[in-house]
From Swiss-Prot:
GO terms for biological process: axon development; negative regulation of endothelial cell migration; negative regulation of protein ubiquitination; protein secretion; proteolysis; regulation of metallopeptidase activity. Residues 1-23 have a biased composition (Basic and acidic residues). It comes from Bos taurus (Bovine). GO terms for cellular component: apical part of cell; cytoplasm; cytoskeleton; extracellular region. Transmembrane segments: none annotated. Belongs to the SVBP family. Enhances the tyrosine carboxypeptidase activity of VASH1 and VASH2, thereby promoting the removal of the C-terminal tyrosine residue of alpha-tubulin. Also required to enhance the solubility and secretion of VASH1 and VASH2. Plays a role in axon and excitatory synapse formation. Residues 1-32 are annotated as: Disordered. This is Small vasohibin-binding protein. GO terms for molecular function: microtubule binding; peptidase activator activity. InterPro entries: SVBP.
Amino acid sequence: MDPPARKEKPKVKEPVSRIEKAKQKSAQQELKQRQRAEIYALNRVMTELEQQQFDEFCKQMQPPGE
């Protein structure tokens, strides 16, 4: 009766490992999505800042009479 009990133990562990792998994959996907959103937000902020600095530079380069 021991050999069938030994066969059942790996079967019990297999679904647990599948669940863990699924959880890890899901967590990794969420992390990747969050990082991507943060990168897009940072890119937007940096682009706005660059545009502001360029506008200020253009104002400084204009002659005072215009």
